[in-house]
């Protein structure tokens, strides 16, 4: 069984760090982002957009699960709000990225999200590039935040 570690986040909150759980989820997020990039290269832009959303969702869930918190749902913006409610500093621009990605969760996959045609007919290389960029920003923030919390632990957090 994994042993979580306690850390103080600049005196505001106490978190339990579960590195193994964080890594399990974060590796999955990174693999999803790699898959999105491959889809974009092949011209499967709707799937690149969807997987960009998935990568961002999985990365924020990695952070929350790594902190011993519950992480439910698929809205990246809501998951970031949960992180913020728990004392983490979430930049507003990151929430904007999350909102853009949240718009891609359903219509990238389901024909009935559109009046006619199929999802793949509606997405472009530019859409995919923007989604991948937004997802990368969220993954970078998650990784930086995790490293900061681990640094607190190394510096003597409880």
Regions from the PLM with identified roles:
Residues 1-158:
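Terminal alpha-helical segments
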